[in-house]
Amino acid sequence: MPQSSPSTAATASDMDKNSGSNSSSASSGSSKGQQPPRSASAGPAGESKPKSDGKNSNGSKRYNRKREPSYPKNENFSNQSRRSNSQKSKTFNKTPPQRGGGSSKPFSSSSNGGRRDEVAEAQRAEFSPAQFSGPKKINLNHLLNFTFEPRGQAGHFEGSGHGSWGKRNKWGHKPFNKELFLQANCQFVVSEDQDYTANFADPDTLVNWDFVEQVRICSHEVPSCPICLYPPTAAKITRCGHIFCWACILHYLSLSERTWSKCPICYSSVHKKDLKSVVATESRQYVVGDTITMQLMKREKGVLVALPKSKWMNVDHPISLGDEQHSQYSKLLLASKEQVLHRVVLEEKVALEQQLAEEKHTPESCFIEAALQEVKIREEALSGVAGGRAEVTGVVTALEQLVLMAPLAKESAFQPRKGVLEYLSAFDEEAAQVCSLDPPGPLALPLVEEEEAVSEPEACEDLIADDSLGEGTVCAELSQEEPIAKPGFTQLSSSPCYYFYQAEDGQHMFLHPVNVRCLVREYGSLEQSPEKISATVVEIAGYSMSEDVRQRHRYLSHLPLTCEFSICELALQPPVVSKETLEMFSDDIEKRKRQRQKKAREERRRERRIELEENKRQGRYPEVHIPLENLQQFPAFNSYTCSSDSALGPTSTEGHGALSLSPLSRSPGSHADFLLTPLSPTASQGSPSFCVGSLEEDSPFLSFAQMLRVGKAKADGWPKAAPKKDDNSLAPPAPVDSDGESDNSDRVPVPSFQNSFSQAIEAAFMKLDTPATSDPLSDRGGRKRKRQKQKLLFSTSVVHTK
């Protein structure tokens, strides 16, 4: 027992150093370790006060009880709650009913200390962990058995849940890859001494950047160097797709101490060795209303090169750079060392020498000379390789020809035996010899025709799927229509070829499914359609190739991902298709026309709203528009038709047309009486005829000379107004949208409140001013007609008298 006292005191002193306060229970435990906790807490309380005067002068028992878990048996001090610690106080009445015999002692034995920890843990388990997290919101999702996954993260996982990101992302938002976009929309001249089997089989396989000799870009405008803002000279392109002058990019890279620098446009890393030669060709940008020529294309299944049907050939390898007839339809162009030297390197050398001659005395000349040095090194490398291979070229060519001719000879030897015998029939006992050994030529021609004709059903299926882009009708109607008998047209299940129309200049512009269905109806199949068609562009819709689009448009599966293409709708005319075909698809064509008109109206309204919002930010508001077309609110003067032998009077004005006044001015109590001054009949007889013009005439008022001729003579009475009522004055205006756009579609716009309300008031005033007509039955009987009682329709501050 004397040995436990120093150890306990040492523990208490350590606690004083760490926590900055002493515990009275520690001193009581060291002096009276065998006494009950009640006497220990009451007796030696005074002994603990001098020890805690430094930092806690009040000596609160509650405070000291909070520091109790400093003993060795209480190892879970950081995990215990205030509730479990407060139960150790003598004033706490809500203690557990059964604590055990010696369990009331705080630190009597190791078993009791472990039991106290278990009780504290059991009490914490009864409550939610959210109640001990402070003033934060409580999450009760675990009670509802509900888990919320953020948008874009839900999806199907493979195996152990580590599937690819693209398959888990059901929303289809994929990260943008600059190199993928560049390789999908450009053409590459590559060295021919490499293997491109993977690129020829999969359109999404990226080309090795080290094998690229030149990049060809087809754009609607000539690019400019972002450094000098001029058309690039000896242009170079980076892996991120930005084009610079060779001297400008060398100047930019020389400013950095490192071997690479950030792209001035997109801040990607730019290395000197990654710069490739680039040629940008400008193509025509078609808009609505232009005339475009499309040609019929043919592509075999599994082949990534689509060629015109008139120029079609079996393509089993990338097209060479020298093939000008088919080079614009291939993504990869194979080039030999000699072709790279003459068609790439020498052209850059000529451009740099011309630039050096123009800017020889400028600070930029040193970078032009550096570019010329790079061209010289590349030229020597290509010349050395070309000279070393010149001797072997003839031998290699001869060997390749021998290798290619050997399989052809074997195939020609065994080919006549393929179509000699038919299969044995189940009901025949003998094998019939169908034909003798015929040459393969006549047999191959129907086979080719059959393969080409087979493509029609699947092409129709593709057009059905393509209609989702074109917003046309379902293509199932083609199967219900009457089939047109065409030679060589057969309905088979599979197809080895795809047929489609593409722009003649090689741009990725394809014919709309509505036009394709018209051609299929007219000619029976796309195979038998014209090789070229020319028509006016009606609509152009741009798209980007994705997995979803590729599944729905199988004839475009040769385009790589992120490749941009357009679907073009043409206005086909009777020279290409007949009037009967156009009438058959008139509903689809009219539906698409209404959709275009609706889209154009919505676009104009959107632009108008944006313009109004922008003007409001700048403090400019639209002007007030007062319609002057309403002749009731703004009356006009009709011209007098005066003659020399007739005077102004009630009888003459009825025949020749008099002053047409508004209903408000014809009323006896109207306030417009003082606005008009009547003319004298005598003055009108002696003076030449004059006219008071209306809105359509040049002079709506009296001239000064006419006023002098009239003088001061005035008529005693007013001329009787012609009882001519303009029925169109109160006619409702044409249906106009709230934005001022006329809507020719089925939608009926809401009428303007201002116009309808003012017209209703005018109609009410006219009913009040019009005298009641006498009843013919009452006039015959001689009885006095009873005066009709007027009905009040609208009350204003204006007083109308009868």
From Swiss-Prot:
Single GO term (MF): zinc ion binding
Skewed-composition ranges (Basic and acidic residues): 114-124, 716-728
Biochemical pathway: Protein modification; protein ubiquitination
Compartment(s) of residence: Cytoplasm; Nucleus
Polar residues bias (residue ranges): 645-654, 793-802
SMART domains, sorted: RING
Purpose: E3 ubiquitin-protein ligase that catalyzes monoubiquitination of 40S ribosomal proteins RPS2/us5 and RPS3/us3 in response to ribosome stalling. Part of a ribosome quality control that takes place when ribosomes have stalled during translation initiation (iRQC): RNF10 acts by mediating monoubiquitination of RPS2/us5 and RPS3/us3, promoting their degradation by the proteasome. Also promotes ubiquitination of 40S ribosomal proteins in response to ribosome stalling during translation elongation. The action of RNF10 in iRQC is counteracted by USP10.
Family listed: Belongs to the RNF10 family.
Name of the featured protein: E3 ubiquitin-protein ligase RNF10
Gene name of the record: Rnf10
